[in-house]
UniProtKB/Swiss-Prot annotation:
Phomoidrides A and B (also known as CP-225,917 and CP-263,114) are potent inhibitors of Ras farnesyltransferase and squalene synthase. CP-225,917 and CP-263,114 inhibit Ras farnesyl transferase from rat brain with IC(50) values of 6 uM and 20 uoM, respectively. CP-225,917 inhibits squalene synthase with an IC(50) value of 43 uM and CP-263,114 with an IC(50) of 160 uM. Residues 1-18 form the signal peptide. Glycans are attached at N93. Keywords: Glycoprotein, Signal. This is Phomoidride biosynthesis cluster protein N.
């Protein structure tokens, strides 16, 4: 835990602007690299077309490698991570609800490239990626946030219902409650983008 706290503190040295939308919790100023198909890279708060984000992105923590310039990676090689993507602007009867678009545990970090990939023997429950598809109207905010995965981690039972690939199942996902029940620390990094349907 001490090593992870030092890891987060050093990553904070790379911060520039907030990497999560105003008011979003848990917030972070640490940059998560998010690159969609055709090399479309997410810059915090910028707009993407829905078809640019229709497939799951490649994630990276290049900011970690920018801090640690030696051949030996600073992070511990046994660490795993989990990522979430959430639409925080789904409206029902005048009230906004968060919609889970993606939950992927068992991500491992390459110390050489800074890229995150799914552990080859992962059998953890997950929520398959669903691209943005907001209704016509104002742009929706899509937040990606990544956490260090605790050792001996298990998905909290209360959240199994959100894994089904339907809007009805995934609506109302409470990331703050998930963090509490899963015993997660503060986010390692985040990013977010806007998507609108004309």
């Amino acid at each position: 835990m001490i090593l992870f706290s030092i890891f987060v503190a050093l990553l904070a040295a790379t911060r520039a602007q907030s990497q999560t939308p105003p008011g979003f919790k848990p917030s972070t100023e640490l940059h998560l690299g998010v690159t969609f198909q055709d090399g479309v890279s997410v810059q915090a708060g910028h707009e993407l077309l829905a078809n640019e984000a229709k497939s799951a992105p490649q994630l990276d923590l290049h900011s970690l490698l920018a801090i640690h310039h030696t051949q030996t990676p600073f992070y511990h090689s046994t660490w795993k991570f989990m990522v979430f993507m959430i639409d925080i602007d789904v409206e029902r009867n005048g009230t906004k609800y968060p919609l889970l678009h993606w939950y992927q545990p068992d991500l491992i970090l390459s110390g050489r490239t800074g890229r995150l990939s799914i552990e080859s023997d992962s059998n953890m429950p997950k929520a398959m990626y669903a691209g943005p598809a907001p209704p016509p109207g104002p742009a929706h905010r899509y937040v990606e946030v990544i956490f260090k995965q605790p050792e001996r981690y298990e998905l909290p039972a209360d959240f199994e219902k959100f894994l089904e690939n339907t809007i009805a199942a995934r609506l109302g996902f409470d990331i703050e409650q998930f963090v509490k029940e899963a015993g997660l620390s503060e986010p390692v990094a985040g990013n977010w983008f806007l998507t609108a349907t004309s």
